[in-house]
């Protein structure tokens, strides 16, 4: 008795491959509005913002990214602004 091997449809394989590539590469995210850019991004961006280095005790910080996803600008922020 010969067993037939089930073959996946080429379309299913193509869709799965595209989904895997999308998940690995990640979607291009749009950064939040940077209302308080304070300079180039550094590892101490968050600490500098919340410690008052820039003249105000901000509540949080994030980096604004370029089109390649690299952090470029340190953005301090007030949560309820």
Swiss-Prot record:
One of its GO terms (cellular component) is extracellular region. GO terms for biological process: defense response to fungus; killing of cells of another organism. Disulfide bonds join 34-63, 45-74, 49-76. The keyword Secreted applies. It is found in: Secreted. Residues 1-32 form the signal peptide. The keyword Nucleotide-binding does not apply. Its main location: secreted. Keywords: Antimicrobial, Disulfide bond, Fungicide, Plant defense, Secreted, Signal. Belongs to the DEFL family. This is Defensin-like protein 313. It comes from Arabidopsis thaliana. The lineage of its organism: Eukaryota, Viridiplantae, Streptophyta, Embryophyta, Tracheophyta.
């Amino acid at each position: 008795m010969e067993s037939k091997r089930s073959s996946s449809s080429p379309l299913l394989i193509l869709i799965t491959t595209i989904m895997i590539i999308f998940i690995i590469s990640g979607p291009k995210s749009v950064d939040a509005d940077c209302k308080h850019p304070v300079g180039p991004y550094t590892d101490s961006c968050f600490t500098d913002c919340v410690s008052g280095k820039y003249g105000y005790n901000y509540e949080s910080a994030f980096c604004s990214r370029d089109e390649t996803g690299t952090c470029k600008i340190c953005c301090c922020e007030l949560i309820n602004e």
